[in-house]
Regions:
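Active-site-proximal helix-loop elements at catalytic-domain edges
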Residues: 1-22, 291-305
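Residue-level signal for well-ordered alpha-helical scaffold segments within enzymatic catalytic domains
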Residues: 21, 51, 135-139
Length: 381
């Protein structure tokens, strides 16, 4: 197992090219060379396998040898197949192993079956951001435990997940949340007994403050906006789960729709599917000009230059997102958050032009119960 070996830590930027090539090939050509339990050659492949969640690493003593082993044979999917009984010995084990989150068909639109991946099943923040936060924290865990404190700017969900993880691992956290956020975020962080700074109108305003105060106080800045541990979480879990689930269900998967906040999960999805299943189109969804949708924003420049961008980016207004989410609730009994409503709206538009039978997947980052105040203006309509 990768965790049984000692290896000099590489930052993701150093091994992401190797990881992408490994995904594209689907096989590991050379073993990892060790002396005893220490990796001495093949560090990029070692960290790639570990970041992908492979359960095995082929090793040879002293020097690398040709092995040509498939990622599947190295346990690529093992960690996302879950526990049949769903019994866990700790909350950390729950967060790591309660996989995959559900994939459910919610609508037929013309020739398209529309499936929703329900990310509110993540237990800490009730959102996809549990994945991001766990990857950010575990990627810097030695530094975090040495310094004892973490600072981070967040629109809410990442901050909630970080505050929960702080209790699991035993460090303090200060989260910077904009005044425009729904009350769920600050209240949950306070419920965890951690510090929350509520000010400004956006995370863009708060990022310099979080960085400045982290440097002043000797805290670790997680920096979900620039740390590649963010999109790596979605290569390892979100994309891999969708790949496994769509194959299990026999889907004719043509497109995956996902909203863009930090753009971390879109980058993870685009990178994974372009390498492993290039016939699947990943579509990014952002707020239309003049619209505000919690947790997502417009991007003038792709923020993850080492990873693939979505094949297309679609604009959705806040009103369209809300009305589609409420329509889905009234059809299915499931109320997506506003960002999920935006992705569903984009998928429904695309389905109108679909000429053959196909399946689309929409990633729904969180539940609409967090946004009832915002939905209230459309209720009864």
């Amino acid at each position: 197992r990768p965790e049984d070996l000692r290896a000099r830590r590489l930052e993701p930027e150093a091994y992401i090219p190797a990881l992408k090539e490994l995904l594209r090939r689907g096989t590991l050509e050379l073993s990892v060379a060790v002396r005893g339990q220490e990796v001495v050659e093949g560090l990029e492949d070692y960290w790639s396998l570990r970041s992908l969640g492979c359960q095995l690493v082929p090793v040879t003593e002293g020097q690398r040898a040709r092995v040509n082993m498939s990622l599947e044979s190295l346990g690529l999917y093992d960690e996302v197949t879950g526990s049949e009984a769903r019994v866990y010995g700790s909350v950390l084990e729950l967060v790591r192993r309660d996989r995959p989150t559900p994939l459910v068909m919610i609508k037929r639109a013309g020739r398209v079956r529309l499936w929703a991946k329900l990310e509110w099943y993540n237990p800490l923040s009730l959102s996809i951001k549990d994945r991001t936060a766990l990857s950010l924290v575990e990627g810097k865990l030695d530094d975090i435990m040495s310094r004892g404190k973490v600072y981070e700017a967040s629109s809410s969900n990442t901050g909630v997940a970080v505050s929960a993880l702080s209790r699991i691992f035993g460090f303090s956290a200060r989260l910077y949340i904009p005044e425009t956020a729904e009350q769920f975020g600050p209240d949950m962080i306070r419920a965890m007994g951690q510090e929350v700074v509520v000010k400004g109108s956006s995370t863009a305003e708060l990022r310099p403050l979080a960085r400045e105060e982290a440097e002043r106080d000797g805290a670790v800045l997680l920096n979900q906006f620039e740390s590649y541990y963010n999109p790596l979480a979605h290569i390892r879990w979100t994309a891999k789960e969708l790949d496994l689930q769509s194959r299990f269900a026999g889907l004719r998967l043509k497109a995956v729709f996902a909203t863009m906040g930090t753009a971390g999960h879109v980058a993870g999805l685009a990178t994974y599917f372009r390498a492993r299943r290039p016939e699947v189109k990943v579509v990014g969804v952002q707020p239309a000009e003049g619209s505000s949708i919690p947790g997502i924003r417009r991007h003038d420049q792709w923020p993850w230059p080492l990873l693939d961008a979505p094949a297309e980016v679609v604009d959705v207004s806040d009103e369209e997102a809300a009305r589609v989410a409420l329509a889905i609730a009234r059809e299915t009994g499931l109320l997506p958050g506003l960002s999920g409503g935006a992705s569903i709206a984009a998928a429904l538009r695309a389905a109108e032009g679909e000429a053959e039978e196909a399946d689309y997947i929409v990633v729904v980052p969180d539940h609409g119960v967090k946004y009832l105040r915002l939905y209230s203006r459309y209720l009864g309509a």
